[in-house]
C-alpha cells in the first residue's frame, strides 16, 4: 500500500506534469505562428528584350505578358494584368 506522503508526492508530480504540458502547448502555438515566413515572389522575371542582346527587361510571369526595363513598372502592370489568386 502507498503511504500518504508517497501519495502526496505523486499528486504534486502529476499536477506539475499537467501544468508543464499546458505550458508547452501554448508555447508551441506561439512558435508556430512566429515561424510563418512570408516570401515575396515578384510577378516579373528578367528576360532578354526583343531589341537587345542583354537580359535587361522585366516581363510578367502570368497569362498576359508585359515587358518593361523598369522593375517597378513591370510589377505594377503585371499585378493589374494578372491579379494574384486568393489564398484558401
UniProtKB/Swiss-Prot annotation:
Cysteines engaged in disulfide bonds, as pairs: 44-59, 49-78, 57-74, 60-67
Tissue spec: Expressed in stems.
Signal peptide: 1-23
Record keywords, A-Z: Disulfide bond, Signal
Similarity section: Belongs to the MEG family.
Name of this chain's protein: EMBRYO SURROUNDING FACTOR 1-like protein 11
Lineage: Eukaryota, Viridiplantae, Streptophyta, Embryophyta, Tracheophyta
Amino acid at each position: 500500500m502507498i503511504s500518504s506522503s508517497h501519495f502526496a508526492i505523486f499528486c504534486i508530480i502529476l499536477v506539475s506534469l499537467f501544468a508543464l504540458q499546458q505550458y508547452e502547448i501554448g508555447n508551441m502555438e506561439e512558435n508556430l505562428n512566429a515561424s510563418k515566413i512570408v516570401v515575396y515572389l515578384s510577378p516579373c522575371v528578367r528576360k532578354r528584350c526583343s531589341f537587345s542582346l542583354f537580359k535587361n527587361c522585366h516581363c510578367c510571369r502570368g497569362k498576359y505578358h508585359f515587358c518593361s526595363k523598369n522593375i517597378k513598372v513591370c510589377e505594377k502592370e503585371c499585378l493589374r494584368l494578372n491579379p494574384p489568386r486568393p489564398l484558401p
